[in-house]
């Protein structure tokens, strides 16, 4: 995101450098380029700001979803008091799975907010809804789809089957996690595309219409 902001600043700088004061009378928020095109800087800047903020929020959702991969690494483990590593504690994964469920609740809350944001395209909003659907499906499976997950002594195999994408047993919960990851990736790509589209308006503005010469 920092690199994208730097690119935006550089683009704005180049636009200002290429502008002059000739041509038709401009509004306070407009600048004219030497080829006769005009930029409404207030409008374009607002679009870029909103698109960037939306993309940043989607990135937060992606980070939460991807963090399940890190939680999965703690299956069957406990903190080792005399070391920086872990000790084995087999088949005690209830709290870990509860933490994963809480994470998905947080994802759901963020998605509710994203869906309500005005100004995003129907395509992007549709992708938000897809992510919400997959997240809800995962929550349902974690919460009540399999009684083996909702207990303190949830086994290592059941926990891996639920949240470890490298597990090859192909459980239903794990399949839902894969679908959620795929949907989030698509949403992030679309959100970043909105930012790029907003930036392109700086380099492809609308031509100023010349006044009619007819008397």
Curated annotation (Swiss-Prot):
A cellular component term, taken from the record's GO annotations: cell outer membrane
Signal sequence range: 1-18
Membrane topology: Lipid-anchor
Keyword annotations: Cell outer membrane, Lipoprotein, Membrane, Palmitate, Plasmid, Signal
Lipidation (S-diacylglycerol cysteine): 19
Localization in the cell: Cell outer membrane
Superkingdom to which the source organism belongs: Bacteria
Stored InterPro entries: Lipoprotein_OspC, OspC-like_sf
A Pfam family recorded for this sequence: Lipoprotein_6
Location, primary (coarse class): membrane
Gene3D superfamilies reported for this sequence: Lipoprotein, type 6
Lipid attachment site numbers (N-palmitoyl cysteine): 19
Function noted in UniProt: The Vlp and Vsp proteins are antigenically distinct proteins, only one vlp or vsp gene is transcriptionally active at any one time. Switching between these genes is a mechanism of host immune response evasion.
Additional remarks: Genes for both Vlp and Vsp families are on (usually) unnamed linear plasmids in B.hermsii HS1.
Family (UniProt): Belongs to the variable small protein (Vsp) family.
Protein name (database record): Variable small protein 6
Protein source organism: Borrelia hermsii
UniProt gene name: vsp6
């Amino acid at each position: 995101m920092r690199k994208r902001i730097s690119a935006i600043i550089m683009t704005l700088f180049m636009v200002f450098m290429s502008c002059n004061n000739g041509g038709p009378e401009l509004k306070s928020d407009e600048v004219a380029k030497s080829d006769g095109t005009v930029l409404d800087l207030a409008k374009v800047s607002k679009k870029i700001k909103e698109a960037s903020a939306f993309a940043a929020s989607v990135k937060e959702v992606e980070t939460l979803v991807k963090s399940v991969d890190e939680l999965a690494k703690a299956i069957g483990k406990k903190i080792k008091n005399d070391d920086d590593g872990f000790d084995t504690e087999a088949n005690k994964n209830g709290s870990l799975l509860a933490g994963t469920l809480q994470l998905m609740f947080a994802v759901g809350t963020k998605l509710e907010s994203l869906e309500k944001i005005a100004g995003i395209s129907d395509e992007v909003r549709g992708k938000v809804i897809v992510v919400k659907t997959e997240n809800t499906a995962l929550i349902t499976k974690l919460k009540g789809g399999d009684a083996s997950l909702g207990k303190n002594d949830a086994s290592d195999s059941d926990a891996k089957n639920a949240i470890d994408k490298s597990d090859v047993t192909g459980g239903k919960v794990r399949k839902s996690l894969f679908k959620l990851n795929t949907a989030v990736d698509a949403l992030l790509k679309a959100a970043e595309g909105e930012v790029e589209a907003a930036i392109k308006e700086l380099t492809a503005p609308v031509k100023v219409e010349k006044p009619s010469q007819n008397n």
